[in-house]
Regions:
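Transmembrane helix segments
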Residues: 38-44, 162-205
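Residues that define the loop-to-transmembrane-helix transition and helix capping
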Residues: 19-20, 59, 101, 169, ...
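Membrane-interfacial helix-loop-helix junctions in multi-pass membrane proteins
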Residues: 14, 48-51, 183-241
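Short, membrane-interfacial amphipathic segments enriched in basic
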Residues: 1-8, 154, 198-209
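Aromatic- and glycine-rich beta-strand/loop motifs that create alpha-glucan
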Residues: 1-28
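Hydrophobic alpha-helical transmembrane segments of multi-pass membrane transport proteins
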Residues: 31-38, 55-129, 150, 158-159, ...
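Short cytosolic juxtamembrane segments of multi-pass membrane proteins
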Residues: 249-255
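Alpha-helical transmembrane segments and their short interhelical loops
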Residues: 100-180, 225-247
Length: 255
């Protein structure tokens, strides 16, 4: 456990030495939040949208931008892994008595802390713009937890790609190839029932869609604690499955 704590702070301090990466991963969702909420608000703030229970297009948009922030942070986690490989950091850790699990857990915990801050910033800006979480602090906690757990799963997959490829360009391309469709083929910008049938079909296989829908419900419609608890459980199981797969890839990469 002490090794995990040390590595967590090491990764956090490393992020602190390149603050532009953290700022950029938050700035892009914020730019999209402001741009889309202002550009499409008159188009989307219609009786039809409100008939679905959403208070405003801004409140509808915030959860999707929270997810976008953590997905980009997850991609950066994979790129950081490639950087550690290239600089020989993993070789140094490999010959140390630190377990492989502690090394990866330290990275995941650092990523999780970063994601919580980013999600809070996006939600805070959305609140300043007029959005409100109708389910209060408990709903806010549930929304942040779901989004962060999704980010942990995504970061584990990004690290898995990084360990397999050992190539920053390939990790970046693969990450973008997965991340952008995960956002656009989801209810992040418009309710699924307003979108083409093929998008609705693809969205059903998109884990980001379910997290975004939970967030949108907690923002505007109300809480369904049974559904929210199931979502948290599924994400926790997914994280527990993704982590061992990444550990196995790490063992193979440092064998």
């Amino acid at each position: 456990m002490p090794a995990t704590v040390v590595l967590t702070f090491r990764n956090l301090f490393k992020n602190g030495r390149t603050p532009m990466l953290v700022i950029a991963s938050v700035a892009q969702p914020l730019v999209w939040l402001v741009m889309f909420s202002q550009t499409f608000s008159r188009l989307a703030d219609t009786p039809l949208l409100r008939s679905l229970g959403y208070r405003s297009y801004l409140a509808f948009l915030v959860p999707g931008m929270m997810v976008l922030a953590v997905l980009f942070t997850a991609l950066q986690s994979g790129l950081a892994m490639v950087s550690d490989i290239d600089r020989g950091m993993l070789d140094k850790l490999r010959v140390s008595p630190i377990s492989r699990v502690s090394i990866l857990l330290g990275r995941v915990l650092a990523d999780s802390a970063t994601m919580v801050v980013q999600v809070a910033v996006v939600l805070g800006v959305g609140t300043l713009m007029g959005a409100r979480v109708e389910t209060g602090w408990l709903g806010t906690f549930g929304m942040v937890a779901c989004v962060t757990l999704l980010g942990v799963v995504w970061a584990s997959l990004a690290n898995l790609i990084a360990l397999r490829s050992r190539n920053a360009e390939l990790t970046m391309v693969a990450g973008i190839f997965v991340t952008l469709p995960a956002i656009f083929l989801s209810p992040a910008y418009f309710p699924l029932r307003f979108q083409p049938s093929w998008v609705q079909t693809v969205a059903k296989a998109n884990p980001a869609s379910y997290v975004i829908e939970v967030g949108q419900s907690l923002m505007s419609i109300g809480n369904d604690w049974g559904r929210d608890a199931r979502m948290l459980a599924v994400l926790a199981v997914a994280a527990l499955v993704a982590m061992p797969a990444t550990v196995a890839a790490f063992r193979a990469a440092t064998h």
